[in-house]
Structure formats: structure tokens, C-alpha cells
Curated annotation (Swiss-Prot):
The gene is Nit2. It comes from Mus musculus (Mouse). This is Omega-amidase NIT2. CDD domains: nit (cd07572). The lineage of its organism: Eukaryota, Metazoa, Chordata, Craniata, Vertebrata. Pfam families: CN_hydrolase. The modification N6-acetyllysine is found at K68. One of its GO terms (molecular function) is 2-oxoglutaramate amidase activity. The modification Phosphoserine is found at S26. The keyword Lipid metabolism does not apply. Homodimer. The keyword Cytoplasm applies. Its EC number is 3.5.1.3.
Length: 276
């Protein structure tokens, strides 16, 4: 199957977890009704984003939130990329994305590898590492359409991760993410287009909707970029479902026209994973 429909849910996240779960599942069902085959929720979709919130909202996996995601994936017969939630495991907290298949089974669990620790004087200072621990594994899953690679937000800044996913056969990279009003306008679209062109893959980002009253204000603008670096579709800042029909034939044509993946000089340089 050379084409499939991707849906990105730009959810308006509140401080009430049960409301977030109910709304997220409702929008997933709507996306499925509109023909989506793969659906992604945004980063931290079940709780406000912030180091003070992570411990209070953290759950085990499986747990309340992932059980709901499993059920709605099965009900809707879709592949569901569950954005991310704060996960508690063995006394540590992680920023974790769970993916469910059309039968409701857990396909893969991605823990954010690169923690968001930045300090831009006069603009924003944030340290996920105050409460979160980093993941230590690559995360891909297979579908009848293509192999998909996963990252969360800050992971997108690291070109090596995307390159390893491309080496492993991924044709779509999905990054649930919540850039802010400093990094968003500067780097959000730029990074997506760079990862797409560098690796000749589709890149999709699912952001929460913007809430100007939140302690951390998300940039919004969920986006899909094709392997040519063209923005196929981009949301504004409000809650919405973004749809894009992914054409893998176009990906193959681009790789044939500009065969950079075959032209890399392994005799001079390499990017390789140190773990499976």
C-alpha cells in the first residue's frame, strides 16, 4: 500500500487528567472516522507540561491512560501513537510514548532519550532532568504501510537519531513535541524540514494546542513535512485534527532522483548505534 492517511491531534490539554483522556479518545475516534490509518497524540497529552506536574500525574505503564489508548486503538482499528505521558517505573520518572496496534496491543514504548535542559537568558530556562530520567533505546514499529521511528520533542534536535532510524528502514518519523514561544518560531519547522531532507523521510510533529494561561506555553503548529522538505500541512495554535495523506511512491521517487542514502562515504564517516 503506497498511500495512507496520518492524523495529528493537537489537543487542548487541561489540568484534569480524566478530561484530557476523554477528549483525546473522542478526537482519535473522529480521526479514524475520517479515514486515518495512523493517529498521533501530542507530547504530555494527559497532563500539564512541567517538572512540578510530572510526579503528580505519573502512571505505571500499563495504567489508566495507556489502557484507554489501547481500547480506543482497538475500537477504531488504527495504529495509535500515544503522544507521551509521565511514566513512573522503579522509582524513576520518564517522558514516555506508547504505541498501540489495531488490535489494542502495545507495540513499542519510547522513553524520551534527550532531556529538555536549556537556558536561554531572558527567555526560557527549563530542566526536565530535575524530575525525569532519560530513555536509552531506539523505538520503531512496523505497519502495513511503512516502518515508523519515534522521538519526543527535544529528540528531534539530534540528527543522529533520525539518521539511525532511516538506516533501519523508517520512512516516517513522528515526534510528539511541545516547543515553546522561544524555540518554536525559530526551530520547530526548520528542524522538521532538516530531518526530512537529510534522511529523505516524512516527518510529523504533534503539539498540544496553545494555552496562553499555562505555566509552559506550547507553540502549537503540528506539522507534516515530506522527503523533499515541503510542508504538506500545518496547524495553527487552536485544538484541531491535522490530516495528511502520505505517499510512499513520492518518497521512492525522491530517493531515486537524489540518491544520497546510497552515496554516503562509509569509508570516511559513519553514524552507528551502540544498542539494538
Amino acid at each position: 500500500m503506497s498511500t495512507f492517511r496520518l492524523a495529528l491531534i493537537q489537543l487542548q490539554v487541561s489540568s484534569i487528567k480524566s478530561d484530557n483522556l476523554t477528549r483525546a479518545c473522542s478526537l482519535v475516534r473522529e480521526a479514524a472516522k475520517q479515514g486515518a490509518n495512523i493517529v498521533s497524540l501530542p507530547e504530555c497529552f494527559n497532563s500539564p507540561y512541567g517538572t512540578t506536574y510530572f510526579p503528580d500525574y505519573a502512571e505505571k505503564i500499563p495504567g489508566e491512560s495507556t489502557q484507554k489508548l489501547s481500547e480506543v486503538a482497538k475500537e477504531s482499528s488504527i495504529y495509535l501513537i500515544g503522544g507521551s505521558i509521565p511514566e513512573e517505573d522503579a522509582g524513576k520518572l520518564y517522558n514516555t510514548c506508547s504505541v498501540f496496534g489495531p488490535d489494542g496491543s502495545l507495540l513499542v514504548k519510547h522513553r524520551k532519550i534527550h532531556l529538555f535542559d536549556i537556558d536561554v537568558p531572558g527567555k526560557i530556562t527549563f530542566q526536565e532532568s530535575k524530575t525525569l530520567s532519560p530513555g536509552d533505546s531506539f523505538s520503531t514499529f512496523d505497519t502495513p504501510y511503512c516502518k515508523v521511528g519515534l522521538g519526543i520533542c527535544y529528540d528531534m534536535r539530534f540528527a543522529e537519531l533520525a539518521q539511525i532510524y532511516a538506516q533501519r528502514g523508517c520512512q516516517l518519523l513522528v515526534y510528539p513535541g511541545a516547543f515553546n514561544l522561544t524555540t518554536g518560531p525559530a526551530h520547530w519547522e526548520l528542524l522538521q524540514r532538516a530531518r526530512a531532507v537529510d534522511n529523505q523521510v516524512y516527518v510529523a510533529t504533534a503539539s498540544p494546542a496553545r494555552d496562553d494561561k499555562a505555566s509552559y506555553v506550547a507553540w502549537g503548529h503540528s506539522t507534516v513535512v515530506d522527503p523533499w522538505g515541503q510542508v504538506l500541512t500545518k496547524a495553527g495554535t487552536e485544538e484541531t485534527i491535522l490530516y495528511s495523506d502520505i505517499d510512499l511512491k513520492k518518497l521512492a521517487e525522491i530517493r531515486q532522483q537524489i540518491p544520497i542514502l546510497k552515496q554516503k562515504r562509509a569509508d570516511l564517516y559513519t553514524v552507528e548505534s551502540k544498542k539494538p
